[in-house]
Structures are given as structure tokens and as C-alpha cells.
Amino acid sequence: MVSGVGGSGGGRGGGRGGEEEPSSSHTPNNRRGGEQAQSSGTKSLRPRSNTESMSKAIQQYTVDARLHAVFEQSGESGKSFDYSQSLKTTTYGSSVPEQQITAYLSRIQRGGYIQPFGCMIAVDESSFRIIGYSENAREMLGIMPQSVPTLEKPEILAMGTDVRSLFTSSSSILLERAFVAREITLLNPVWIHSKNTGKPFYAILHRIDVGVVIDLEPARTEDPALSIAGAVQSQKLAVRAISQLQALPGGDIKLLCDTVVESVRDLTGYDRVMVYKFHEDEHGEVVAESKRDDLEPYIGLHYPATDIPQASRFLFKQNRVRMIVDCNATPVLVVQDDRLTQSMCLVGSTLRAPHGCHSQYMANMGSIASLAMAVIINGNEDDGSNVASGRSSMRLWGLVVCHHTSSRCIPFPLRYACEFLMQAFGLQLNMELQLALQMSEKRVLRTQTLLCDMLLRDSPAGIVTQSPSIMDLVKCDGAAFLYHGKYYPLGVAPSEVQIKDVVEWLLANHADSTGLSTDSLGDAGYPGAAALGDAVCGMAVAYITKRDFLFWFRSHTAKEIKWGGAKHHPEDKDDGQRMHPRSSFQAFLEVVKSRSQPWETAEMDAIHSLQLILRDSFKESEAAMNSKVVDGVVQPCRDMAGEQGIDELGAVAREMVRLIETATVPIFAVDAGGCINGWNAKIAELTGLSVEEAMGKSLVSDLIYKENEATVNKLLSRALRGDEEKNVEVKLKTFSPELQGKAVFVVVNACSSKDYLNNIVGVCFVGQDVTSQKIVMDKFINIQGDYKAIVHSPNPLIPPIFAADENTCCLEWNMAMEKLTGWSRSEVIGKMIVGEVFGSCCMLKGPDALTKFMIVLHNAIGGQDTDKFPFPFFDRNGKFVQALLTANKRVSLEGKVIGAFCFLQIPSPELQQALAVQRRQDTECFTKAKELAYICQVIKNPLSGMRFANSLLEATDLNEDQKQLLETSVSCEKQISRIVGDMDLESIEDGSFVLKREEFFLGSVINAIVSQAMFLLRDRGLQLIRDIPEEIKSIEVFGDQIRIQQLLAEFLLSIIRYAPSQEWVEIHLSQLSKQMADGFAAIRTEFRMACPGEGLPPELVRDMFHSSRWTSPEGLGLSVCRKILKLMNGEVQYIRESERSYFLIILELPVPRKRPLSTASGSGDMMLMMPY
């Protein structure tokens, strides 16, 4: 559906003409391509591989490029563009010249035109000199061109002009501050004024390859304060909409989508707002709509995948909001410096003009203006998506698109608020999708269990004759079971004669497979497909034995597709040649003709799992008939092993009890009735209640304050059901005279206690005493006592505190915050809390974290307090800080809410130790853990010997070559020691993994990793090509040398293991110097480790990008190295090209720079910038 993308400027339907790759070097391999509805054929029973998905994506790119060329040629020849015919004649098998694809990407990315509602200026970042501008810039800025420019009076707006001369002095200062920011987009919009006219503009900045692009959109007020207030008001409206989303009952994605379109329409005022969902086969569907009553409905509309090209979808993950003000407006040319080698990239510009075909489509459907917003969710790394490119797992789920029947311009602050709403919608949607997936997995597992139980208790026919049946496992129209030559059909299924013909075809053409799935039997090559007709188009079959088969069938797709606008009325003038939603719908129906809904990955997983279970069940049933005597002998051995395991677990349990009793944090436990059965020394000290007195008391009735009873009751009931909660505040009574009846506040984590049968028998609470902080916060919020004395006291009991006014500007930043973050009060006061303070100064972990923080802050300003919100961030030196945020409304003496107070709580080492003790209760991998611990222990002795030998060699007289060899040996020994000494993989997951910081030379790392690969290179007959400039080896950088060495060695050895024998392996290293925002220097290093051919198998690459699961030790090693690299703010990609495959590792490393500290000691210490 061309209009579908609205502002995206994408295909015939909204995809074409706008959002393509940032550069032509971003090949189709760089995005996840789903299996197209247009293509079919046979697939293995296992879910489709990522290689197959990438192949489909490449095919999609070629189709997109061909359609683009047809449209361009029709314009040049004066002929009309026949939309439907072009779709029919453009096939997936046809090849497209590479230059045609490059031209297609470049045409839209570097089109050279903008929309006329604003103007654009491109600037060299280092000199502020203009390198390009739109032709309407002079008019919008009120600059009159010189009739005859001279040296004394040069042209005011010309190439080489300092852009600061066009704006007021205060505006120039704001631009200078933005240009040095690490993330320039976080400061958008910058409020600036034209020097000639004083007219205000929103300056929206982003970096490109040749400089900085400044998009200038006219603002509606001349007071910057009003602009800030307007932006905050837009954010408040978005927060209100987000609150409505969060208040919805869970488990209803349709209701969530319906609510978001209503919210967006209320927020923006567009005539129509829709939610587009991209299906697994990449075609789109309108799943929710809010519109003006007189407009034609689009709800239920489906459109082919080609309507929104792959390039457009990729770019929506980069530029998430796109507005077209008037599709009929004449675009404005961008002129640029002649010295630039190619047209400027306008992908990130808010003003970029739509492509002609998209404007034409919008006009055909009566839509003049549009706003398109990406809905991004976290892709499931475990499903293997995105692993081939090595990219992170952000996935474009769909779009929210707004249409208007007249021109409409939404100011940037409101668009930013909409983006904010979309991020929250994506988070909420992601949770709902995960919940739906979990529910589906549970349902499938339950069905599988019941089916297997039927199979063992009754005859095999029970899985089709009883309920549930195999039809309940996946969505289908029919199913069948062929068992020992007897046929059991269900629902819409072929006849017995037809199914035997299908089996003969399977055994003749797919005998070496374990099964097959297809959405079109005809395209899969089955000669009898026509006889089956539309009733049986798609089929999935699982081979149980050589003579037993399970089948599932699906009818053609078109019968399930309903759209209210599909009916063609006589007065409608459009036809198949014109680009229109009705044309898109008919094209989609043509594409899916004689084709069923594709089999989804989760469905293939369910079928394959049932296949394995049934195979094992059949084998066990047969084996049970002949092995009863053997079983009787073996069983006592299993019992003895069980007793030994119980003894070991008992020893562990006794050790756990001892650790809990002596812990320095409060720990207590209750049985299933809520009565105390555990009470350690610390909680006894805090409450004045001894262990003997506490035992048997009711936690809720006897020990908790009445106002806290509801919270604790809820916490208990959820934990007894297995739902464990964290960071819940509990208010406990005290019982000793010394405590004078004062309350004790403890923040607890609830942990379900289980017996040896895994039944929940109680709840254990691990807590942290926050009484002192609570008292301070209560006084502070109520403005009791001396305000300044509390906030700025150096007393360690005063927590880190910051405050925001009603416009989210920072107005308080106490000493504890200065110490925690490294940023002084004077540096942050007056800046925007969200974006500037937290975002630019203190970086957060991604846009989702920024969105969640903004919601919390605005909720507090709106009067809704938040307690113990997880708030991790990076301090000034790049150190990762884990904190809990409490945000409270800030109230004036008159009781009016005037902002927010925020308190940070840093978990104490004691609490972290207690949580580590809690995690040790997991004994599933107890035996393997013991073996690993044994290996790590005994390997330390020879390591110690190696270290001693190396130290002796260091004291001898060595030449330069010998010194280098010794240095390499020492580095490898240190690498082993670090790996053996730090086995806590969970700390890598949660970001608390400690990275050391030291100066080192890149050449030392290269020597160490090459030395580890030499034996394997010789064994496999491989030539090592080192493309490393000598000057790079001598560069001194700052970071964790051993960890960098570890992960680079792992990636290199993996490449070597899977390189073809007697071939080559290449190491390429390049670097680019970079100036950081604080004036420090850094280098961006790119390591490329390549080999010819396909390289690593897809299963291993999938293991590498798993978030939690792995199937091989080598996959685990790659996964751990990827996560360590991520903690260093680096990234790794695995890229397959036509003739080679390679790892691309990107890491920024600061160059040590000495700067004297302003201390009285004058000891010559250094301040070093650290990236992580």
C-alpha cells in the first residue's frame, strides 16, 4: 500500500522515494529479510535459516530497484506508470545490474531536494563554513542577495560563509555548544534567531559524512521560554497518552493498537491515523484505525511487501519520524560546494522531499499531508534473526501513519513527543508480544504433553480422534495422521488416495529430509496440487518413522482476508494502473493466489518438537517391551546416584543457612501461611526482636505497619505463586525500648522457597536498610528544616539528589550527585534533565532507557510518584553506575506542584553480596560447576610457574626480538589468568562486569592474538595476511588490554577454524582519529578478520547472538566476547559477502592525555578519559 508509509517516502505505497540505506555500501545483507509472500517452495521442517531470509531480502532489493527504474523511465518517456502491470512483470528471479541498485539507493538517499516549509544549511563541523544550502534559505532568513558581490562586501549566504554570521550572537553560542556534543541529536531542537529579521527557528541538527546538516523550521513564538514550555506541554500530553496505554489490561494487542491510534489522533489532529503491522512474510496489514467519519476505512487492508521497500524499512530504524507537509508542493533544490564528490546525504533531514511516485500515490487517495512513525521492538535474538549481519536485535514491527486531506505541519516539539509516545508504545507492545509468545509456548507444550500421554495410554489414533488433537497444536484448516498404513484425517484434508500420492511424492523427492513445509504445494513441485485446489494449498509434514507421517493443511490465504474498502463502487474512478490502496489490495490478492498463510517460525518449532517427542516415545515404547529385567537392575544404581546428589545438596543447604545467618544485610523468611521461620542477626538488630521471639509470628499481622499490609500481602501472594518481585519497600515495627517504637524501612527482594520436589513452601526476603535515607527524603519532600543544609550536606547519609522545574530543567544538583557522576553543579544547572544532563552528559543505555526515564520524570511533575525505578547510567569517566531512582513531586508552600525531586539509591556492597548468595541457590548445574571450579583451581599452579619463569627471563639481557616474544608470552599468561579468575558470566549480562583500565600499544595486542593462532594456521595450511600499517602498532591507547586481546583472539580463531584449508585468513586494522566532546582525543579502530567462502556455520553465528541460550562451547565463547565488547561500547558484526566472510569489530579507544588535577598535593596525577 503506497500511501501506507505516509511520510516515509517509501515505495509505490509509501515506501518508494524516501527511506533507503544511508549509503550504497549498506547492502541488503545488513537487514533482516523475511520470507516473501511472493515466493514459496519447499522448506525444511526446521524453521527457515537466516541465510534463506537474507536471500529473500536480497531478492526484495532487486525487485524494489527494478520497480523504481520502471517508474523513472515512465516519467522520462511521458507514459503513465502502470502500477499493477509492473508488479506482475517484476519477478523475483530476474536479475538487476548492481549499478541499477546503487542508482536506486542513491536517488532517494541523495535526491538533492527538500520540502519548502523550511530551509536547510549544511556546514563543515570543524570550521562552521557553509558547504551547502537550499535555494529558499535566503528568503526564509531574510537575506537580500548582493547585486554585485565584492571582496569588501561578499555574498552573505555563500559557500564558505561562517554559518554563525547568519544568526544572533546568542544563537551562535547555542550552535557552538551543540556542535561539540557527543550526541548532537539529543540537543534538538536548538532555538535560534535570524540575524537579519530576528525571526525564530527550530534548528534540528544531525551529522552526515561531510559535516552537520541544520534543518531550519519556522517557529511560532519569539520567546524561547515559551518554546520550552510548549515542548514540555507536548511531552506531558504524550505522557498522559502513555499512562492510558500502561493502564490497559494485558493480553490484548488489538486494544493496545486501537488506543494508540486514538491517542495519536488526539495529539496531532490528523484526519486518519493507522497502525500498520509487518507480517513475517514482510507483507503489511492495517490492524487499527481512527479516522474522520466520512473517510473510506482502511482497517483490514493488506498490501504486498514491495509497497514498502527493504531500504525504507531499514531507514525507519534510523530516522523514526517522517513528515510530509504538502505532497503537491514544489520541492526546493539543494545547492552544494563543487568540491564535494557526491550529492549530500539527506536521509536524516526532517525536510527531505518525498519521491514523485509517493506524492502521486498520496494525491490519488486524496491525502495531502502525512506523518509516519516507526514502531520498534526488541527482536528475539534466540530466533536467529539479525545474526548474519551481526547487528543488534532492534526490529521494525510496523508503522503508525497519519494522513490529512489538506496540508498540515506539526512543529518539531510535538513530533518529538509523538516519537516519545512511539517508543513507549514499542516497549508496551514488546511486553505484550513476549507475553503472547510465552502463553503460546505454554499452550503448545501442554498440547504436546497431552498428545504424548494419549499415545502412550491409548492407541496412536488417539492423537486425532480425541481432544485435544494435532489440529490444536498449530493454526490450520485440517490435519492427518498416517500410521502403519492407516489414514486418520481431520478437518479439511486430502482423501486417502490423494494423501498416499503425496507420500509417494515426498519419498521420491524429499526422502533425505525429516519433513517439509510450504505455503504452495504447486510451487513446491507437487504435480497433484491442482487437484487439491484452494482447499489445500499449504502443508507441513513431519516424518515420525519411514512409514508414519503427521500432516497439517492450510487453505488459500484470500479467504481469510477481509477489507471493508475492497468492494469497488461504480462511482470509483481508480483502476489497476493507478497507484491506490485498492490497487495494492488487489496486487496482494494476486500475489497470494493459490497460496496459504506461511508457516511461522514458532509453529515450525512446535511441529518439530512434537516430532522429536513422538519419535522418542515410539522408541521407548518398543524398548520397554524388551528391557524390563534390565530396568530392574539399573534402577537401584539411579537411586544410589540420587542419594549422593541429595547429600551434596544438603551440604550446600547447610552452608547457605550459615551465610544467611551471618549476613550483614537483613534477611528473613516466612512459611506458606505467612509466619516467620527465618530471622537473621541483622534483622533482629534493626527491629530489636530476637530470633526466638520472632519465630512463629505473623509477618503481616504482628510485624508490619497497617498502612503497609496491602503491599506486603500482595508481595507474599505473588511470591507464593512463583512471581518474585524486587525493590519493594517494607515498613517494620520495632520492639526494643532503645528504638522508641520508630519504624524500620527495608527494601526487599522476594524469593520463592522450594522443597526438593520443587513445590513452593514459603518466601525468603533479602533486604537493605534504608531507614536513614527515608527519613531524610520525607523531610526534604515536605520542606521541613533547613533546605540548603540537607541538600548540600557532605554527610554520607544524604543520598544523591537532583531536582527539575516544571519544564524539566535542572535546578538542583547536590554534592552527592557531583561525586557520583563527576559533573559539577555549575555544569548541569539550567540544562534539560532528559537529553542534556542524562543522555549527553551522563549517557543512558539506549533510547528505551531515555524514554522510561522521561515517563518517570513527567509522572512526578504530574503528581504521580515513582519508587525504586532501576536507573543505570554512565558517569563522566564512562564508568557504569547502577542506581535506583525515586521521583517525587516538588510542591510549593501553597501546595502547588512545581517540579520533581529525584533521589538516587546506590545498592550497598552488602546487598549485592546478599543477592549473589541468593543466586547460589540455583543448583541445576551443580556438578558442572564443581568440575569447572576444579579445573580453574588446578590450572593456577602451572600458571604460577609460567609467571615465575617469565619474571626470571625479564631480568636477563634480551635483544629486541626476544623481548617482543617475552612480552607476547606474558600477555597470553595474563589472559588465561583473567579468564580463570573471573567466572561470573552473570555480571557480564547485568553490566556490573569490572573492566580494568591501562595504557597499552595496539601492536602488543596484535602480536598476542597472532601468537595464539599460529599452530592452528599451520595445521590447516592457511596463509595469514596482515594488513596493519606500522604506524597503528605504535599508537598508545587506554582500555582493558587483556579483555580486548581475549575477544579479538576468539574471533580470529573462529575465522581460522572455518576457513577452507590451504587458503588464506586476513587481519585488517584501520583507525580514525576522533575529537570527543570534552576535548579529549580518541581513535575509532576497525578490526576485520576475513576468510574466503561462507566461513562460520549459521548455527554458530546464531549462538553468538543469543541472549541466553547456546548449543556449543564455541558459541558460548563468541557470545561472551560479544557481550564484553558491548560493555566497552563496541560492536561486532558478522558479514557474509559473495566471495568472503568476515568479522567486523568496531571499538573506540581514548588516547591518554595528561591533564593536571586541581589538587593541593601537586603530585602530577593524570586525568584520563575512559570509554567504559
Swiss-Prot record:
Gene3D superfamilies in alphabetical order: 3.30.450.270, 3.30.450.40, Histidine kinase-like ATPase, C-terminal domain, PAS domain
Reported induction: Inactivation is proportional to temperature in the dark.
Expression sites (tissue/organ): Expressed in fruits, flowers, leaves, stems, seedlings and roots.
Database matches in InterPro entries: GAF (IPR003018), GAF-like_dom_sf (IPR029016), HATPase_C_sf (IPR036890), His_kinase_dom (IPR005467), HisK_dim/P_dom (IPR003661), PAS (IPR000014), PAS-like_dom_sf (IPR035965), PAS_2 (IPR013654)
Region entry Disordered, spans: 1-54
Every PAS domain range: 652-723, 786-857
Domain of life: Eukaryota
Function, in words: Regulatory photoreceptor which exists in two forms that are reversibly interconvertible by light: the Pr form that absorbs maximally in the red region of the spectrum and the Pfr form that absorbs maximally in the far-red region. Photoconversion of Pr to Pfr induces an array of morphogenetic responses, whereas reconversion of Pfr to Pr cancels the induction of those responses. Pfr controls the expression of a number of nuclear genes including those encoding the small subunit of ribulose-bisphosphate carboxylase, chlorophyll A/B binding protein, protochlorophyllide reductase, rRNA, etc.
Subunit note: Homodimer. Interacts with ADO1 and PKS4. Stabilized by interactions with PAPP5 and FYPP3 which are enhanced in the phosphorylated Pfr form. Interacts with VOZ1 and VOZ2. Binds, via its photosensory domain, to PTAC12/HMR/PAP5 when photoactivated; this interaction stimulates its localization to photobodies. Interacts with CRY1 specifically when in the dark/far-red (Pr) state, but not when red light-activated (Pfr). Interacts with PIF4 and PIF5 in response to low blue light (LBL). Component of a red light-dependent nuclear complex made of PHL, PHYB and CO. Interacts directly with PHL.
Protein name: Phytochrome B
Species annotation: Arabidopsis thaliana (Mouse-ear cress)
Name of the encoding gene: PHYB
